[in-house]
């Protein structure tokens, strides 16, 4: 007996880095595409990039989420849901099918510096989750998707160990605030 497969791949579009969602022309295109294709999730990454002006060294928990809120406010107001990658992906350039992908050197520096300390990362993520629950409500945030990117270019035991340590911390922190 065959069953109809649920079309889960047709309800999400990739936007690129989160800061693109601050641009009005990108927002207009998303609204137009939503009307045409009726998707539910917007997938983006680099929510901790410098464009959001969040001081990652602020350990008193008073992070400035104002610019990040603009992204979430837009999505929620349009009836869309975030699908956030909590990792920091470099912009990659693919010249042709045979070439190697290259990342932007400017981004490479903040990719490696921002969350070298797991406690610092946990403190920030804890504050972010508290903020999201307070601003948007647990019921809403429970419907959001979150993932954590692994850089495929780092195939080593140390890279895997660090990734899974970070992933475990992210999973525990997110689950503390959200059942989704």
Functional labels for PLM-detected ranges:
Residues 1-40, 44-47, 58:
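Mature N-terminal, pre-catalytic/accessory segment of carbohydrate-active enzymes
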Residues 37-180:
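Substrate-binding cleft and catalytic face of glycoside hydrolase catalytic domains
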């Amino acid at each position: 007996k065959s069953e109809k497969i649920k079309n889960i791949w047709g309800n999400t579009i990739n936007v690129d880095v989160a800061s693109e969602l601050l641009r009005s022309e990108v927002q207009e295109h998303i609204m137009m595409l939503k009307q045409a294709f009726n998707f539910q999730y917007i997938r983006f990454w680099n929510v901790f990039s410098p464009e959001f002006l969040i001081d990652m060294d602020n350990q008193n928990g008073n992070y400035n989420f104002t610019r990040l809120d603009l992204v979430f406010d837009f999505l929620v107001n349009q009836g869309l849901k975030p699908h956030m990658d909590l990792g920091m992906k470099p912009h990659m350039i693919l010249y042709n099918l045979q070439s190697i992908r290259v990342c932007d050197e400017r981004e490479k520096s903040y990719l490696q510096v921002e969350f070298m300390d797991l406690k610092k990362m946990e403190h920030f993520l804890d504050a972010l989750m508290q903020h999201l629950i307070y601003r948007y409500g647990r019921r809403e945030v429970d419907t959001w998707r979150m993932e954590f990117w692994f850089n495929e270019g780092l195939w080593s035991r140390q890279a895997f160990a660090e990734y899974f340590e970070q992933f475990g911390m992210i999973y525990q922190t997110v689950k503390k605030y959200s059942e989704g």
